[in-house]
């Protein structure tokens, strides 16, 4: 079974950046978000994971940059939009901009009734981001605790969530390897598909994630590993096939 790869473009203050463990102020600047996204599309990406960090942290938004990327590249690549989608207005804006899928994080923890209603309305165009420390969820740009992972999943499964994007916060941006045990635990407890995020540092990490494909881990987000040139996207795509 093949693995779908989603190169990440995280946008802060109009620039493409990478954070360490999701901490505000830890970013490394990688220049134009549009150029970053175009680089991954030209290298063969079928999906881009596009994140508005300012919206996630509540420090503004980068809607103009995100809209440009979707407008210019949306006919060549599927875009998963994430960051600050917490209500009808922000969700509608993301979908109207042309996102193929929208990733809901904090709202799923703070407003479960709303999350249930949009899952029912939009189906597989809505994924839920589960950002985890141990078995505890992190919320609002990872600055607060949001409850037990498996209790939250039980509720989301009951309302028909079709995909979880699972990030071990301790691993993200650290190039220390993914939390395979966490991914296995999540995938074994749900019929929803699972996207792995955080910690991928070498091609063997992708091979390890690919072994979980048969239990529902069908995709992986690539961030720091690509920007730090640990491997090329072409090399990663060859492993993921």
UniProtKB/Swiss-Prot annotation:
Stated EC number for the protein is 5.3.1.16
Q: Which domain of life, per UniProt?
A: Bacteria
Q: Does the keyword Cytoplasm apply?
A: yes
Residue intervals passing through the bilayer: none
- Pfam families associated with the record: His_biosynth
UniProt subcellular location? Cytoplasm
Question: What family, per the record?
Answer: Belongs to the HisA/HisF family.
- Protein name per its UniProtKB record: 1-(5-phosphoribosyl)-5-[(5-phosphoribosylamino)methylideneamino] imidazole-4-carboxamide isomerase
Source species: Bifidobacterium longum subsp. infantis (strain ATCC 15697 / DSM 20088 / JCM 1222 / NCTC 11817 / S12)
Lineage summary: Bacteria, Bacillati, Actinomycetota, Actinomycetes, Bifidobacteriales
From the UniProt record, report the name of the gene that encodes this protein: hisA
């Amino acid at each position: 079974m093949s693995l779908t790869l989603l190169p990440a473009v995280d946008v802060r203050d109009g620039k493409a950046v990478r954070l360490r463990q999701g901490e505000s102020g830890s970013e490394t600047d990688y220049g134009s978000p549009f150029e970053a996204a175009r680089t991954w599309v030209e290298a063969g990406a079928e999906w881009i994971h596009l994140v508005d960090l300012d919206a996630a942290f509540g420090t503004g938004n980068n809607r103009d940059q995100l809209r440009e990327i979707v407008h210019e590249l949306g006919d060549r690549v599927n875009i998963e939009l994430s960051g600050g989608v917490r209500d009808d207005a922000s969700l509608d804006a993301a979908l109207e901009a042309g996102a193929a899928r929208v990733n809901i994080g904090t709202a799923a923890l703070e407003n479960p009734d709303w999350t249930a209603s949009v899952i029912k309305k939009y189906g597989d165009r809505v994924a839920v981001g589960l950002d985890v420390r141990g078995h505890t969820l992190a919320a609002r740009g990872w600055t607060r605790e949001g409850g037990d992972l498996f209790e939250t999943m039980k509720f989301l499964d009951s309302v028909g969530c079709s995909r979880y994007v699972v990030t071990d916060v301790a691993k993200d941006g650290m190039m220390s390897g993914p939390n395979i045990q966490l991914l296995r635990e999540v995938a074994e407890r749900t019929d929803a598909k699972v996207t792995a995020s955080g910690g991928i540092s070498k091609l063997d990490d992708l091979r390890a994630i690919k072994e979980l494909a048969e239990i529902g881990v069908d995709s992986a987000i690539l961030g720091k590993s690509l920007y730090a040139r640990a491997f090329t996207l072409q090399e990663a795509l060859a492993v993921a096939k």
